[in-house]
Amino acid sequence: MTVTGIIAEFNPFHNGHKYLLDHAEGIKIVAMSGNFVQRGEPAIVDKWIRAQMALENGADLVVELPFFTAVQSADYFASGAVDILSRLGIDSLTFGTEEVLDYQTIADVYSEKSEEMEAFVESLPSDLSYPQKTQKMWEKFAGVDFTGNTPNHILGLAYAKACAGKGITLNPIQRQGAGYHSLDKEVSFASATSLRLHKEDSNFVDKFMPNSKLFQTSPQVSWDNYFQLLVYQILTNPDLTSVFQVNEEIASRLKAAVREISSVEELVDKVATKRYTKARVRRILTYILVGAVDNSLPKSIHVLGFSQKGQFHLKSVKKSVDIVARIGRKPWDMLTQQADNVYQLGNPELCEQNFGRVPIRVK
């Protein structure tokens, strides 16, 4: 049977995600961000709720991306997620994209010319951001065009790069309805961004989310819930450069700006430059919030939930893969658990995120 991998955040889970799961084949394994997501912000509902949403809509197994995989630029995010899915035995990767290209051929190009392509990236001017350098690499070596705001397409290229030479078949699915960051409510499939913005509109949420009641009754958070704590962390840390990816320039810009702002987005706007993108600044603020220092990734894989098919698949790979089903009996990743502790501070109604929690089972 085909084993299909899906890399996701489900922030929150919506009809577009269900469409993706419906078009995936065989056993469907999801590698999902935990309580903080790739663009550098807390997930609107916790990882357990989002895993349950996925399992109730077609996923067979949901595993957690460690913090240092989940909150990273596209290449590192993709590489870490593909590594986990590869160890779980996937033979195909299904993903949504705004541009349906031959990603398999693109992966082959990278497999053949990776050294030359990475050398090209290194040769580009330092005032370019890493995403800009990567786009120039794909344009030059694979003839890829970039039109407008296409974050899923950029992730698709990162997946192609991560899967190169691994024997994993790439299965792109045309993104349906609104664009990734679209705020439009008059569409066939609403974006996660739009659902977060209009979360109080129950009719809108009901229309575009298969698990709308679960979402609406679950504790929710946003950056606003952590703003004061973030300001405290910036003001009281004597050496911000001890935090992952914070250099002297970023530290200086943060210290200068933090007393002049009243929201995280204002801080992002003041600190971001052409070289330091807003997404990168948000990730850095997330590292500061949770006190992240450079850390190795865990070798074991944390399971959030499974169906019966997913449970059978886990049994078939457990001899070759170190699986953690209950944190406490067995340690997993201290940084992710530290981040979860901070996440819980955002809403007093949030449940314990690790100790005593067991995988969700869906029949």
From Swiss-Prot:
Keywords from the named record: ATP-binding, Cytoplasm, Ligase, Nucleotide-binding, RNA-binding, tRNA processing, tRNA-binding
Binding residue positions for ATP: 7-20, 96, 152, 175
Recorded catalytic activity of this chain's protein: cytidine(34) in elongator tRNA(Met) + acetate + ATP = N(4)-acetylcytidine(34) in elongator tRNA(Met) + AMP + diphosphate
InterPro entries: Rossmann-like_a/b/a_fold (IPR014729), tRNA(Met)_cyd_acetate_ligase (IPR008513)
DNA-binding found in the keyword field: no
UniProt family annotation: Belongs to the TmcAL family.
PANTHER family named in the record: TRNA(MET) CYTIDINE ACETATE LIGASE
Purpose of the protein: Catalyzes the formation of N(4)-acetylcytidine (ac(4)C) at the wobble position of elongator tRNA(Met), using acetate and ATP as substrates. First activates an acetate ion to form acetyladenylate (Ac-AMP) and then transfers the acetyl group to tRNA to form ac(4)C34.
Full protein name: tRNA(Met) cytidine acetate ligase
Organism expressing this protein natively: Streptococcus thermophilus (strain ATCC BAA-250 / LMG 18311)
Upper taxonomic lineage: Bacteria, Bacillati, Bacillota, Bacilli, Lactobacillales
Gene (UniProt): tmcAL
